[in-house]
Amino acid sequence: YNAALKRLGDERPDFLAAVTDLTASACEKRNAVTPDAPGVFYQSVMSYCRRAQHGKFPLNMTYPIVKHFDGLNDGLVAVDSARWGERFTLLEPKGKRGISHGDVVDLNRENIPGFDVREFYVSLAADLKRRGF
């Protein structure tokens, strides 16, 4: 991965450090020195894959690494690392396929049975509007 990232322009890639920086323990350390700002509504959204094959490259490769350190994950971030704020939403995959990190950010522009990413973000924005944001 480092060689591929270097060809893409990263002068000093460190793939493993990037992945381990998202472990639950690394997030806990970072959160301890990053307090919430007063008056800001914090919420988090997370999904997970059922198997490594449910994420496209490179998430299919990072899934087992994250699983080894922290368990249930979306191919990049562990569920326990993502919990933050007043509201936490866990997107539960329907059926055998999971919902990868790439799926949640609509990286692959895929239609996933039981999960419409565009409608999810519309409902998220509508909820923020209802809350007065």
Task: List each language-model region with its residue ranges.
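Helical cap/lid subdomain of alpha/beta-hydrolase-fold lipid enzymes
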Residues: 1-133
